[in-house]
């Protein structure tokens, strides 16, 4: 019976890689996209090398790239050998219209950039607290933990700037009584055009300052007393005089 000729496989790169005379019109042709190259052809198929030379001669006679679809038509006209795996090559317009899909998911670093940038900057919430309701993240995320802590902080208390006359009145009241409560504090605050909270805080701070000054004075007095005793003891040792405790007042001598 008639035996069909064995199927032969070739690559487009093998056609254009051979040294062949090119027509003069090649320089005027537009640049075509480079064909996809495969691995170097191995000598497994004995008919492959001979077919490459014949196909190159045929392509040289017709002119390389004389037709935009020539490269792909050559590949279609000769079915590939089943022994050699060959992947179909799509035309250039198909490549442009359908880009290759990504084989893996995007990197987590780039995926995280799609999130709300405010979750990475707790100082933004601390600075603009009235926008806190717009920045709600996952309750279990560490970024959200930082944001909630920043929002949960109590605002700093504004320090009251007292006038000299107010300070003088407060000092006089403190000398009379270190604790002002009830109606007395309310009356004092009304006379100074202050709130009861401001008067209360001032007296608390003033009592703390008074105790600190008292401790410092007692500490300095004790240090001076110790220094004086030390000098007296040294003078007695130098002059070999007995201390008052060592003098026997019951002796008749």
UniProtKB/Swiss-Prot annotation:
A GO term from the CC aspect: axon
Family annotation (SUPFAM superfamilies): Homeodomain-like
Record region (Disordered): 213-253
Alphabetized InterPro entries for the sequence: EMX-VAX-Noto_Homeobox_TFs, HD, HD_metazoa, Homeobox_CS, Homeodomain-like_sf, HTH_motif
Gene Ontology molecular function: any one: sequence-specific double-stranded DNA binding
SMART domains: HOX
Record-level GO BP terms: anterior/posterior pattern specification; brain development; cell proliferation in forebrain; cerebral cortex development; cerebral cortex regionalization; dentate gyrus development; forebrain cell migration; forebrain development
Name of the molecule in the record: Homeobox protein EMX2
Membrane-traversing stretches: none
Keyword field: Cell projection, Developmental protein, DNA-binding, Homeobox, Nucleus
Disulfide bonds: none
Residue ranges of DNA binding: 155-214
Entry's localization field: Nucleus; Cell projection, Axon
Compositional bias segments (type: Basic residues): 225-234
Annotated organism of origin: Mus musculus
Function: Transcription factor, which in cooperation with EMX1, acts to generate the boundary between the roof and archipallium in the developing brain. May function in combination with OTX1/2 to specify cell fates in the developing central nervous system. In the inner ear, it controls the distribution of GPR156 at hair cell boundaries, and regulates the organization of stereociliary bundles in opposite orientations across the line of polarity reversal (LPR).
Main location: nucleus
Tissue expression from the record: Expressed in immature and mature olfactory sensory neurons (at protein level). Cerebral cortex.
């Amino acid at each position: 019976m008639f035996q069909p000729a064995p199927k032969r496989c070739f690559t487009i790169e093998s056609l254009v890689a051979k040294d062949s005379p090119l027509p003069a019109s090649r320089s005027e042709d537009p640049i075509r996209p480079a064909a996809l190259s495969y691995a170097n052809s191995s000598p497994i198929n004995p008919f492959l090398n001979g077919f490459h030379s014949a196909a190159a001669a045929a392509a040289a006679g017709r002119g390389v790239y004389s037709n935009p679809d020539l490269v792909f038509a050559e590949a279609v006209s000769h079915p590939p050998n089943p022994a050699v795996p060959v992947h179909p090559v799509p035309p250039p317009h198909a490549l442009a219209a359908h880009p290759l899909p990504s084989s893996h998911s995007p990197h987590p670093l780039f995926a995280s950039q799609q999130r709300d940038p405010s979750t990475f900057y707790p100082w933004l919430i601390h600075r603009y607290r009235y926008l806190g309701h717009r920045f709600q993240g996952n309750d279990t995320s560490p970024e959200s933990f930082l944001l909630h802590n920043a929002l949960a902080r109590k605002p700093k208390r504004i320090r009251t700037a007292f006038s000299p006359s107010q300070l003088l009145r407060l000092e006089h009241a403190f000398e009379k009584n270190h604790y002002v409560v009830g109606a007395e504090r309310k009356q004092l605050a009304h006379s100074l055009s202050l709130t009861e909270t401001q008067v209360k805080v001032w007296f608390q701070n003033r009592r703390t300052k008074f105790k600190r000054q008292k401790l410092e004075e007692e500490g300095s007095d004790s240090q001076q007393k110790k220094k004086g005793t030390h000098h007296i003891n040294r003078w007695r040792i130098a002059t070999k005089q007995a201390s008052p405790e060592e003098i026997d007042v019951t002796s008749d001598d």
